[in-house]
A protein has these predicted regions:
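Short, low-complexity, Lys/Arg-enriched N-terminal segments of secretory-pathway carbohydrate enzymes
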Residues: 1-49
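Noncatalytic scaffold domains of N-terminal-nucleophile
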Residues: 51, 63-116, 124-285, 289-291, ...
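Internal maturation/activation junctions in enzymes
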Residues: 80-82, 259-260, 356-456, 465, ...
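Alpha-helical support elements that line or immediately flank enzyme active sites
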Residues: 117-118, 200-208, 284-289, 296, ...
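Short beta-strand scaffold segments in enzyme catalytic cores
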Residues: 143-155, 438-442, 511-513, 605-617
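Short, small/polar residue-rich loop motifs at catalytic or cofactor-binding pockets
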Residues: 321, 434-437, 459, 507-509
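Extended C-terminal subregions enriched in glycine
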Residues: 483, 500-504, 536, 545-604
């Protein structure tokens, strides 16, 4: 048996080579199932394109057969799977097109589940609920009902774009000095847990927009958790990288190392207790978590290991629903989350800086990359003044970050032939260093749209899985600032982000819906902590300003900057499907000549992207207001090839 690796040579050339698979690797893979088994329509029945990865050194035998598709979701599992030596499949298109609806998630199974809900007549929000629940099962290192989420929803029924803040909150017993004796407990263990909000947020949005039964939306995720799902390469890598975390927690160990050995990509994983929890929430609604038996079990598990979560915390949790924050940038209108998200404001500031040059050419070429780096540094210096507006007055900073005048003032500080030490950018506070997350985009036939980012923060959250509920606990308290914390950048912590009971921590999550002339132009968002804002900004510029096709806009190599250390991080890595992504040598040389210090980065943010063509193939849809029509152009959905997700189309 042979397996394929990719041998890469500069600048961007990768050559596939074949190596024999060791006997022990082949034997350990026997009986594994095909990740693409849960297909949702007949046109995918003959999929057999296999692409190997440089990160996983095993793939298995034989082509799939005997898949049975039924409306009861049995297609989520391989029939008689133990009879076959099957393979983990990460191939398939990173981009799909449709006139009727699309879902772009970071897992192919979840994209297809979302599309199934659209085919059943569901609103984009129905698809979003089912997709989010699926992601929480199959990508549990990044997402789940033990965490929180931001959602931006555009619905024709209300002619509004609304923001749903289901971000975790600090427990009632939390205080700004609670970690002064052991700062590690801010990031790991039960004390790092915020009050989870995802289920409450999904239910609140579904109540407003959903068409399908609440229970129906849970069935695919329940099936996956109860009867098993295949571990994708990205999850397999995360399990391996966090072996100590997994093996030190009884709940995580039971799910991800059930026989004392870590599960790997291609293995089947079960979380039966989570399936039971999802069944209860499906039957009884979110009250069973926030004021019922599931909540009581979760509180008991968390407090037994030293946490401070109480039933009162769960009962007090409220989803914040507001009009989405709107900003007019570069001839488009973006709709996103208000604070405590810093994403909408951060992206708006950077784009307004480019707009102030007076020409789209300002973003072109290697000089455009230099200007982007400088704009990002100014943005990061400004954004740490933000916090939860229910607790701190951030009116001045919100106004500045949306101001065209303020952006022009910053643009005048950007010099085209030089960069500067970090103190030039007028920083004051230590940066938020959030992690993880998962993002997906949904657009339906009516052009209703959902942009949702969901998170448990660090990989596997707090490193605690509640044994009685199967819920992985978030570590969102790590996103607060603490008065006594000494950060890697040696700057003082941001007072606007200090802990208070019921407060939401600052976030980099950037779910956006983009319109032009009141018509849907795009849906975008990303995962990857503080890398999200730079990544989403670059994809926006690549497509809407520089004219790249949607897939190319997402695939294009990216740069990142954190202000301190004063380093430009550039992508140089071979991703899950074997493609090598690296910043062009020409760009690296140019940036070094300007004084930038560069460092290669084998990682970055993951961006999902949906675009509607407004320049061609447009049909007028139904009237939604006086002399107003919804246009139906071709939808293109892209799942970032940096992870193992694939989009799906109706």
């Amino acid at each position: 048996m042979m397996t394929s690796l990719y041998q890469c040579h500069p600048p961007n050339f990768c050559k596939k080579i074949s190596l024999p698979v060791p006997v022990e690797t082949r034997d350990s893979c026997m009986g594994r199932h095909n990740m693409e088994a849960p297909l949702l329509d007949e046109k995918n029945n003959n999929r057999n394109i296999i692409r190997n990865t440089a990160l996983c050194f095993f793939f298995l035998l034989l082509t799939l057969s005997s898949l049975i598709f039924r409306d009861d979701f049995s297609y989520l599992l391989v029939k008689g799977g133990n009879k076959y030596n099957e393979r983990v499949e990460v191939g398939g298109p990173d981009s799909v097109e449709s006139d009727q609806g699309v879902v772009a998630a970071d897992d192919a199974r979840c994209s297809k589940i979302g599309v199934l809900m659209l085919k059943k007549g569901g609103h984009a929000m129905d698809a979003a609920v089912a997709t989010a629940l699926c992601v929480g099962v199959v990508n549990p290192m990044a997402s789940g009902i033990g965490g929180g989420a931001f959602m931006v929803v555009r619905s024709l029924s209300t002619s509004q774009v609304q923001a749903f803040d289901a971000r975790e909150t600090a427990p009632l017993a939390a205080s700004q000095n609670m970690y002064e004796n052991d700062m590690r407990t801010k990031y790991y263990g039960p004390l790092s847990m915020g009050v989870p909000g995802e289920i409450a947020g999904l239910h609140e949005a579904w109540l407003r927009y959903g068409r399908l039964d609440w229970k129906t939306l849970f069935e695919p995720a329940i099936k996956l958790a109860k009867e098993g799902f295949l571990i994708a390469p990205y999850l397999g890598l995360s399990i391996a990288e966090h072996e100590l975390l997994v093996m030190n927690d009884p709940g995580l160990k039971q799910v991800f190392a059930p026989e004392g050995k870590l599960l790997q990509a291609g293995d089947k994983c079960y979380n039966v207790e989570l399936a039971h929890t999802l069944e209860e929430v499906a039957e009884q609604g979110p009250g069973v978590l926030y004021n019922g038996t599931i909540g009581e079990k979760l509180v008991k598990d968390v407090t037994q290991v030293g946490g401070i979560l109480t039933m009162e915390d769960l009962r007090n949790y409220k989803v914040e629903v507001t009009d989405a924050m709107a900003a007019n940038v570069m001839n488009y209108t973006i709709y996103g989350m208000p604070p405590p998200s810093s994403g909408t404001l951060g992206l708006s500031l950077v784009l307004n800086i480019f707009d102030s040059y007076g020409s789209a050419d300002a973003a072109k070429g290697v000089l455009g990359v230099h200007r982007l780096i400088e704009a990002l540094k100014h943005m990061f210096a400004e954004r740490m003044n933000l916090g939860d507006p229910d607790f701190v007055d951030i009116t001045k900073y919100v106004s500045e970050m949306l101001s065209v005048t303020f952006a022009k003032q910053i643009q005048e500080k950007i010099i085209d032939n030089a960069t500067f030490p970090a103190n030039y950018y007028m920083y004051r506070w230590s940066q938020l260093r959030d992690h993880g997350t998962s993002h997906f985009c949904v657009v339906d036939a009516e052009r209703n749209a959902v942009s949702m980012t969901t998170t448990v923060n660090y990989p596997f959250g707090a490193g605690v899985l509640s044994p009685s509920t199967g819920i992985i606990v978030n570590n969102e308290m790590g996103d607060f600032s603490a008065p006594t914390e000494i950060s890697p950048d040696m700057l003082p912590p941001a007072p606007a982000n200090f802990i208070r009971p019921n407060k939401r921590p600052l976030s980099s999550m950037t779910p956006l819906i983009i319109t032009k002339d009141n018509q849907l132009a795009g849906v975008i968002g990303g995962s990857g902590g503080m890398n999200i804002i730079p990544a989403v900004t670059q994809v926006f510029l690549n497509h809407f300003v520089l004219g790249m096709e949607p897939l190319a806009a997402v695939q294009h190599p990216r740069i990142y900057h954190k202000l301190i250390p004063n380093l430009v991080y550039y992508e140089n890595w071979t991703v899950i499907d074997g493609d090598h992504i690296e910043l062009a040598d020409e760009t690296k040389i140019f940036l070094r000549e300007k004084g930038h210090e560069l460092r290669a980065k084998s990682g970055g943010a993951i961006v999902q992207f949906v675009v509607q063509a407004l320049q061609k193939d447009i049909e007028r849809g139904r009237k939604f207001g006086k002399d107003s029509y919804i246009f139906h152009g071709t939808l293109t959905a892209v799942s970032d090839p940096r992870k193992d997700g694939k989009p799906a189309a109706v």
